[in-house]
């Protein structure tokens, strides 16, 4: 039996929203505030896509509970309220989401953000209505574990062969492969095309418009 692609699952940060600079500077500002070594831009970019606590451990080692709680509170304040770095949607994001839904695709989000963070950016960007469902790292196992994708496919009655995972990081590609879905990378986020292909991306696109054009063209 063959399956047509009908479900497209998007990562959020660096895929639909140009938020990488804000994440990097927020992590660095938080480290400085709590007295930890300030990580490089490259080091922070490499953990984007992971849920927050594993990302912190990868950057700073295992913190004790008091240190971790203090870091989490400061980081969330920094990212949401204190950091002036803009984090807009990519210019073609809304048009692409509209084109894909109009063409009959179901859309979903699988993100390392907490639910509170996703709801906030959905409200700010007025995009929640495009998505049939979503999973956040705060409510299931985080990337690159495939559990997010399993839960999304189960809820929407989609087979892996019908599903595309779109993301900007190697964590997205590894999750997609583990779940048996089609891994598609975008080259304008945290990891470049070469790293995405090395991680298993079957296709790497240079814009969301290119992604939409390819998917709609290949739809029966």
Spans of features found by a protein language model:
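Substrate-recognition "cap/lid" segment bordering the active-site pocket of phosphatases
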Residues: 85-88, 114-165, 170-179, 193-197
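Hydrophobic alpha-helical segments typical of transmembrane helices
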Residues: 26, 40-43, 51, 55, ...
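Glycine-rich phosphate-binding loop signature in dinucleotide/nucleotide-binding domains
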Residues: 2-3, 102-105, 156-162, 218-219
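A metal-dependent, Asp-based hydrolase signature
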Residues: 48-81, 94, 98-101
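Active-site neighborhood of HAD-like aspartate-dependent phosphohydrolases
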Residues: 1-46, 62
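Short, acidic loop-to-helix structural element flanking the phosphoryl-transfer center
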Residues: 4, 81-109, 115-122, 146
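Short acidic-hydrophobic, aromatic-tinged amphipathic segments that line or gate anion-handling sites
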Residues: 203-207
